[in-house]
Every structure is written in structure tokens, then in C-alpha cells.
């Protein structure tokens, strides 16, 4: 019995570990370190219709508990991803989750329609943290009605299951999750980065050229755990959790909160072997915990007692 195997919509995972979109590119650099077939899945870099060169530099800044980034969805565009990146990834025995982004609903739909036809793409991850240029730049993922409409449109054209990536930069993430589930999403991935900023004390100017960026790394892990804990009790679709994972213990904590699989982001920059190392460490930890299969961990923190949501002091 494979104690780490996980079944999700569109995804038969040999283990629940995958690199998060944006922290792994298309895997070419990491393939120099280990066989990518060891991974449960690969979430590739966000793809837009046309190539994007991203934001001006500097666009990365370290923080005491992680990092800020304002890359700006730099990617080679849909055509190159279909013609070069996905065929290259086909040599590995690993399902691909294609991250879809855009500036308009029409762009999301077009990218989703074409990329979902690729033979090694088993699911889509809808990046709804992008600004909607037709609505004054407000992010798709901050208004439940807009997020739901986008989800529904993409579901209508996608040939594979659709997972929606939730932004933590909202007032009520449970309300957002429920709206997206009602619109037909097959699963959720959460959380995306939190908005943050750093200022140079010598120049009094923002360190990032974009001024603000997305905070990731260990600093956001408690927030991710809390949000997954709340959302997993409110929806029936599976959650792929992410946000500051660095160890096998972190993975189990995410499962206890309600995740069914996890994605590892910033830690890949610190240790390129972090994913295969965690995969190797998980069976040892399961033995220590007296757990036969990782699926037994899902939601254990709330399934044993009363469902609870923190409402403030």
C-alpha cells in the first residue's frame, strides 16, 4: 500500500507534495537536482495569452520570516507553453496543474480552453488574484460574485477539473470559498500571498519597484492554517494547502487543518531538494504518529470535536 497516495478530482497523486506555481518555473532548473517524477504533481508558472515580461526590478525583497515578490506574472505566453514547456515536461511521470491568469475574463477563458487540452495537463489552477482591467483594476479574487462568474466561465470551456486559488487579501475567505464552490469549482488551492511592503531606511523609498508585493514563507503559515481550518469546514470540495511549508511536520499540520494535498513555494528557493526530502520524511513521521495512511490526517483537528471559527477577542 502506498501510504502517501491521494486521489483528487483529475489527479491521482503518488504523494501529496507538489511545488507551488511561481516558485518552480516549468521545472527545468530543478530537474538538474532530482527526477521530477518523484513529485505528486507540478503546478507550473502562471500562463497568460501573450508573453509578459513582468514588473521592473527590484522585484524581490527578503523579510525576517520569508520574502516579498512583485514578479508581475512573467511568462513566455500560451503558445510557447503549449509548444515547448508542456512537451518537455511530458518526459516525467507526473501530472501537471496549469496555472491560468489574465487581465480580462475573456483572456482567462481563452487560455483555459487551449491549455486544458494538453495531454499532460490534468487540472487547472485559476489565479484569481490578478487585477481586472475592465473593473478598475480590482482583483478578480476580492469580490465573490466576480470570482464565481469567472469560475463558471472557465468551467464551461475547460476539459479538466478546475481548482481556484484563493487570495487571503479578503474580508471573509469562507464567503469567497462558498461562492466559488457554488459556481462549480472542483477544488481550491490556498493561500496565495499576502500584500506587504518594505521601505529602505537609508532612502525612505520602497524597496520594490512596484512598491508592494506578495509576502510568502514561514511568516504566513499560521494565517494559511487558520484559513484552511475555516474553509475546509464550510465546503465539500478538496483543498490543496500552501503557505510557508518547510517540513513534513508542516505538511501534517496542513492536513490536520483540512488540506488534502499541499504545495511548497518559497522553501524551494532555500533548498532545491525540499520537495523530495519531505516526501521521504513523511512515512517516518506517520510511523511516529501511529498513522497508517496520510488521508487519515485530513481535518483531524476539527473532525474529532466541534466545528469552530474564531470570531475575534
Swiss-Prot record:
Keyword Transferase in annotation: no
Compartment(s): Cytoplasm
Cited InterPro entries: Aldolase_TIM, DHO_dehydrogenase, DHOD_1B, Dihydroorotate_DH_1, Dihydroorotate_DH_1_2, Dihydroorotate_DH_cat, Dihydroorotate_DH_CS, Dihydroorotate_DH_I
Coiled-coil stretches noted in the UniProt entry, renumbered to this chain: none
Keyword vocabulary terms for this entry: Cytoplasm, Flavoprotein, FMN, NAD, Oxidoreductase, Pyrimidine biosynthesis
Annotated cofactor note: Binds 1 FMN per subunit.
GO molecular function: dihydroorotate dehydrogenase (NAD+) activity
EC number: 1.3.1.14
UniProt GO BP: 'de novo' pyrimidine nucleobase biosynthetic process; 'de novo' UMP biosynthetic process
Residues bound to FMN: 21, 45-46, 99, 127, 165, 191, 217, 243-244, 265-266
Enzyme class: oxidoreductase
Cofactors required: FMN
CDD domains linked: DHOD_1B_like
PANTHER family with a match to the protein in the record: DIHYDROOROTATE DEHYDROGENASE (FUMARATE), DIHYDROOROTATE DEHYDROGENASE (QUINONE), MITOCHONDRIAL-RELATED
HAMAP family referenced in this protein's UniProt entry, alphabetically: DHO_dh_type1
Family: Belongs to the dihydroorotate dehydrogenase family. Type 1 subfamily.
Protein function: Catalyzes the conversion of dihydroorotate to orotate with NAD(+) as electron acceptor.
Protein name, as recorded: Dihydroorotate dehydrogenase B (NAD(+)), catalytic subunit
Protein's organism: Geobacillus sp. (strain WCH70)
Amino acid at each position: 500500500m502506498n501510504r502517501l497516495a491521494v486521489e483528487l478530482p483529475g489527479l491521482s497523486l503518488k504523494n501529496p507534495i507538489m511545488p507551488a506555481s511561481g516558485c518552480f518555473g516549468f521545472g527545468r532548473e530543478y530537474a538538474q537536482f532530482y527526477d521530477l517524477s518523484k513529485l505528486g504533481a507540478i503546478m507550473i508558472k502562471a500562463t497568460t495569452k501573450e508573453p509578459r515580461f513582468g514588473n521592473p526590478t527590484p522585484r524581490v525583497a527578503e523579510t525576517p520570516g520569508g520574502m516579498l515578490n512583485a514578479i508581475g506574472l512573467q511568462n513566455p505566453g500560451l503558445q510557447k507553453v503549449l509548444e515547448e514547456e508542456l512537451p518537455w515536461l511530458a518526459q516525467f511521470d507526473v501530472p501537471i496543474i496549469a496555472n491560468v491568469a489574465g487581465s480580462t475574463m475573456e483572456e482567462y477563458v481563452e487560455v483555459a480552453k487551449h491549455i486544458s487540452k494538453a495531454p499532460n495537463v490534468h487540472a487547472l489552477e485559476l489565479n484569481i488574484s490578478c487585477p481586472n482591467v475592465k473593473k478598475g483594476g480590482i482583483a478578480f479574487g476580492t469580490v465573490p460574485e466576480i470570482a464565481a462568474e469567472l469560475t463558471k466561465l472557465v468551467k464551461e470551456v475547460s476539459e479538466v477539473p478546475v481548482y481556484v486559488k484563493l487570495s487571503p487579501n479578503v474580508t471573509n475567505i469562507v464567503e469567497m470559498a462558498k461562492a466559488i464552490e457554488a459556481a462549480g469549482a472542483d477544488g481550491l488551492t490556498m493561500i496565495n500571498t499576502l500584500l506587504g511592503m518594505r521601505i529602505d531606511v537609508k532612502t525612505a523609498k520602497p524597496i520594490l519597484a512596484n512598491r508592494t508585493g506578495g509576502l510568502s514563507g514561514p511568516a504566513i503559515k499560521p494565517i494559511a492554517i487558520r484559513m484552511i481550518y475555516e474553509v475546509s469546514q464550510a465546503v465539500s470540495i478538496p483543498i490543496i494547502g500552501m503557505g510557508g511549508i518547510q517540513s513534513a511536520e508542516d505538511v501534517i499540520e496542513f492536513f490536520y487543518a483540512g488540506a488534502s494535498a499541499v504545495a511548497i513555494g518559497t522553501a524551494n528557493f532555500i533548498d532545491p531538494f525540499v520537495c523530495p526530502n519531505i516526501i521521504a520524511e513523511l512515512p517516518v513521521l506517520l510511523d511516529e504518529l501511529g498513522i497508517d495512511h496520510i488521508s487519515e490526517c485530513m481535518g483531524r483537528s476539527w473532525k474529532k470535536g466541534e466545528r469552530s471559527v474564531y470570531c475575534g477577542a
